[in-house]
Amino acid sequence: MANSYRDLIVWQRTVEMTLALYRLTEEFPKQEMFGLTSQLRRAGVSVASNIAEGWGRQSEGEYKHFLGMARGSNMEIQTQLLIASKLGFGDPEKLTLAEQLSHETGKMLVSLMKKIRSRLPFLFAVNCSLFAASQYSLGYIFDMR
């Protein structure tokens, strides 16, 4: 079990992907500095950051929400890489590597989201039971029967 978001293979893969995006976009035309270059870099950082932020949230529901945001940013990357490819931007090998890392990241995010989703009904039931028990206990303590 992971003790930190840094232990998650999906987070590690996302950092690797982001570095690949930075290396790829170094070769983009200078006029793309505030276009595809900026968009790809920001989306890569967003994927890794959302995984980390979700890890630090209070509930698994919030964590899943941030994983969904990470997945959305990863989809942006895939779209932007396709556009860059069609425009002939970047080294083809670096482009292929970034595409592969993005697809792997996407699969890993979906897998992690499914794992969390399968645990949510159980956690909800446990939380409801604890809430009901605490209400009964408070009623008894304060004679609120």
Where are these regions (language model features)?
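Short, C-terminally biased terminal segments at protein or domain edges
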Residues: M1-E53, R57-R145
